[in-house]
Amino acid sequence: MSLEEKKTTESKEKDKALSLVLGQIERNFGRGSIMRLGDASRMKVETISTGALTLDLALGGGYPKGRVVEVYGPESSGKTTLTLHAIAEVQKNGGVAAFVDAEHALDPVYAASLGVDVENLLVSQPDTGEMALEIVDQLIRSSAVDLVVVDSVAALTPRAEIEGEMGDHVIGSQARLMSQAMRKITGNIGKSGCTVIFLNQLRLKIGITYGNPETTTGGNALKFYASVRLDIRRIQTLKRGTEEYGIRAKVKVAKNKVAPPFRIAEFDILFGKGISTTGCLLDLAEETNIIIRRGAWYSYEGENIGQGRDNTIIWLDQNLEIKNKVESMIKEKLTEGTEVSSNSMKALNSNPTSTIAVNDIKTVA
């Protein structure tokens, strides 16, 4: 027998043995328990829009379905607003969303103003951390819920701490609770296709001289299990004269398993209204040279449409046909491979005095 014939025979025997063991595994553990990656029906990860076009681009499309997402940042940086927009996007597409309000601080009026259908939003205000995470697990296993938001990890108080007296030390109880919960729910999340967003707060490590002293609550388990981690910060307060009407938020993608990480997105959050979608649109239109900025003036197809950013946004909101056309042109350019840089995006109330550099826009070969 030649060497080539010997290799062919061995290959056939291996294929036969592989088919037998794959069949045995599927009989024991169910269909889909093992598969060839090329045969998987979920090769491309589907996404849920964040409500901010700039953040969607930074994430590679939005929040991934069937994954764990962590959003953390300082107080009043826009964490809850960000998740309420995600809930609104899910509901627009006919999906079901749940909000586990461990902080007992959800404002239904504000949620409704962001486009959330509060009548059909599932809300739970659990008494203990164990109760909250058990509810999350059951919602996931039902395969009937598309998005679950937990606000927040810091408020998931273990039962032992609640039943104890004030001042009792229950060291590591919350970290152990989160570690056990993540082990339990991660597999169910992948099977159901449900996205779970955990909001988290920041704490300062004691005695840190060098490096970043900030850390998130609930131990390290969530950091490992999360496919996406977003660090959201307030970088500017938006004012008209002395009146404050919003904030400029900056989001850094600290971790991303489904797209390139460490991208940065900026957008405006208006008090009582949420994320300024038109502001995001203007940012990207300016970056892709669809709308040109010369000094303080913005022009579209050679005609001035507004002096200053505020006036340009108002003009776009009043001319919906052109606004929709600009949005279509942006999506077309991005599909063709135009890459935008968030570093040149300005705040909502800024009146720039110089034109955008052509070098800020790079075309991917």
UniProtKB/Swiss-Prot annotation:
The keyword DNA-binding applies. SMART domains: AAA. ATP binds at residues 73-80. GO terms for cellular component: cytosol. SUPFAM superfamilies: P-loop containing nucleoside triphosphate hydrolases, RecA protein, C-terminal domain. CDD domains: RecA. Keywords: ATP-binding, Cytoplasm, DNA damage, DNA recombination, DNA repair, DNA-binding, Nucleotide-binding, SOS response. One of its GO terms (biological process) is DNA recombination. Its main location: cytoplasm. Can catalyze the hydrolysis of ATP in the presence of single-stranded DNA, the ATP-dependent uptake of single-stranded DNA by duplex DNA, and the ATP-dependent hybridization of homologous single-stranded DNAs. It interacts with LexA causing its activation and leading to its autocatalytic cleavage. NCBIfam families: tigrfam_recA (TIGR02012). Belongs to the RecA family. This is Protein RecA. It comes from Prochlorococcus marinus (strain MIT 9215). The lineage of its organism: Bacteria, Bacillati, Cyanobacteriota, Cyanophyceae, Synechococcales. The gene is recA.
